[in-house]
């Protein structure tokens, strides 16, 4: 799973999830907010990209769930240095998990005050070039995120109670709230700069 700590990106440790190695990054850019995001992620079942970022319960004894192909593909994209925009349109649902994740990354970069940075402009340009990979509704959400327009759940995160945030994110689709939080966590913990 992707976890931040104070070690370098090259440090690795054995993981139980899909037999992979969790990626370590530099210390979180915003430890308090990223801690809240991680707490929120821990309230979700293993939907969307959640298993890449938090420990999820193992399958019951004697059962072997096949690895989710979207998770496997996402993990490959995030670990190999492939363009993060390869996530556009990846997954199922009205707004695919990859698109929700990218909205979260854009929100995280915005929260870190990086909207005017070269990284943000480059990511936005790449997303714009690849919007044809997803559906019209999801493309509209990505355009809004590139313009700094985010859901109420994202805008109020940190200014409302944990319980209110929890409810707002859980109200966003089957896995969209969770996938957005994964992207936000990815950006807030500096993982975007290591792997994006």
Where are the model-predicted features located?
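Long, charge-rich alpha-helical interaction segments
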Residues: 126-128
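Intrinsically disordered, low-complexity linker/propeptide segments enriched in Ser/Thr/Gly/Pro
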Residues: 189-195
């Amino acid at each position: 799973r992707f976890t931040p700590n104070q070690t370098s990106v090259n440090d690795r440790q054995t993981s139980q999830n899909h037999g992979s190695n969790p990626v370590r990054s530099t210390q979180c850019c915003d430890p308090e907010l990223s801690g809240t995001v991680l707490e929120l992620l821990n309230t979700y079942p293993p939907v969307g990209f959640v298993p890449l970022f938090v420990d999820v319960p193992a399958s019951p004894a004697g059962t072997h769930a096949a690895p989710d192909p979207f998770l496997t593909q996402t993990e490959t994209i995030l670990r190999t240095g492939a363009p993060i925009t390869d996530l556009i349109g990846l997954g199922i649902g009205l707004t695919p998990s990859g698109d929700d994740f990218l909205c979260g990354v854009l929100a995280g970069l915005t929260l870190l005050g990086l909207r005017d940075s070269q990284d943000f402009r480059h990511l936005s340009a790449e997303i714009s070039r690849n919007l044809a990979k997803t559906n019209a509704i999801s493309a509209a959400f990505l355009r809004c995120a590139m313009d700094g327009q985010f859901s109420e759940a994202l805008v109020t995160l940190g200014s409302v109670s944990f319980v209110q945030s929890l409810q707002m994110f859980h109200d966003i689709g089957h896995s969209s709230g969770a996938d957005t939080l994964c992207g936000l966590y990815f950006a807030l913990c500096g993982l975007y700069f290591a792997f994006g």
